[in-house]
Structures are given as structure tokens and as C-alpha cells.
């Protein structure tokens, strides 16, 4: 049975609010520590973890669980929107208002978001083709845990340095 529209909107709002607060508290924890207030930083971190847990609750209620392929394609779509519409519009508006520094930043971040879209789409294609850990020609693979570098058509099944499984390797 579909969820009532107001409840659905409230769940979405709760999810976005909790993720925003999580991020804000994490930043404030770092600032507090840099100012010498370690107990305050710890408090912000503890509450931030609670906010993250709350966000996960709302996300699950929204039935947003996706398989990896779906998540990669959804992420690519979100990144596409960010660079091609959102940041492009904001950059134009900043330029029109004479805020050239903000325009430049919006355009620079848009370029990064376009790169993110490409990375998500390439990984989705590799998964779809069964090529996540296979390359037609030798490439460099890096272990995300310890940084071990391996060159070959595929990464080792187990990292020889930290013994993490192949799933920790990505093309460099």
C-alpha cells in the first residue's frame, strides 16, 4: 500500500534534516577540537552518530534500499543533475549578481560533479559487464585499505600486505 503523501514528504524531510545536522555537527566537532575544546568535540561526535542513526531509520522507511547497480545509476543521475542544472544555474545567477568568486567556485565544483558522474557510470558499466575485477589489459590496482599497488589484468584475490579481500581493490 502506498504511503500517505504528507507522511512520505515528512519522512523525506526528516532524512534530509538528519543528514544535514550530522554533517554540521561533524564539522563543529572538528572546530571545537581545534579551539582546544575536546570534550565539546566529543559531544558533537556522539550526537552526530545519533543523527546518522536517525537518518538511516528514515531512509529505510522510505524503502530506498537498492542493489549496488541501482545505487550507482541513481548516484550518477544525481551527480548529473548537480553539474548540469543545479551548479550551472547557480553559477549563472552568481555571475548575474556580480559574485564572480562564487560563480567560479560553482563552476569548479560542477566540473568535479561531472567527473563523479563519469566514475559512477563507468563502475556501473563494469559491474554490468562483470569487469569490476577484470581488465582487458594490465592496469594498476590499489588496495583501499593499505594502499598496496598491483599491476595486472586483475587484482589479487587477497591483498598480500593487509590480507583484505579482492573487493578492496579498484583501478587506480
Where are these regions (language model features)?
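Non-heme di-metal
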Residues: 1-172
Amino acid at each position: 500500500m502506498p504511503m500517505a503523501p504528507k507522511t512520505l514528504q515528512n519522512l523525506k524531510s526528516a532524512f534530509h534534516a538528519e543528514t544535514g545536522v550530522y554533517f554540521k555537527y561533524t564539522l563543529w566537532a572538528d572546530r571545537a577540537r581545534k579551539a582546544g575544546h575536546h570534550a565539546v568535540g566529543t559531544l558533537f561526535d556522539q550526537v552526530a552518530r545519533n543523527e546518522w542513526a536517525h537518518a538511516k531509520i528514515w531512509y529505510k522507511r522510505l524503502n530506498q534500499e537498492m542493489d549496488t547497480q541501482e545505487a550507482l545509476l541513481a548516484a550518477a543521475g544525481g551527480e548529473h543533475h548537480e553539474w548540469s542544472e543545479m551548479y550551472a544555474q547557480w553559477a549563472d545567477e552568481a555571475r548575474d549578481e556580480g559574485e564572480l568568486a562564487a560563480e567560479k567556485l560553482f563552476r569548479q565544483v560542477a566540473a568535479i560533479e561531472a567527473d563523479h558522474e563519469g566514475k559512477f557510470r563507468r563502475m556501473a558499466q563494469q559491474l554490468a559487464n562483470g569487469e569490476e575485477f577484470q581488465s582487458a589489459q594490465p592496469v594498476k590496482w590499489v588496495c583501499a585499505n593499505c594502499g598496496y599497488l598491483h599491476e595486472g589484468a586483475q587484482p589479487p584475490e587477497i591483498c598480500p600486505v593487509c590480507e583484505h579481500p579482492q573487493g578492496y581493490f579498484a583501478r587506480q
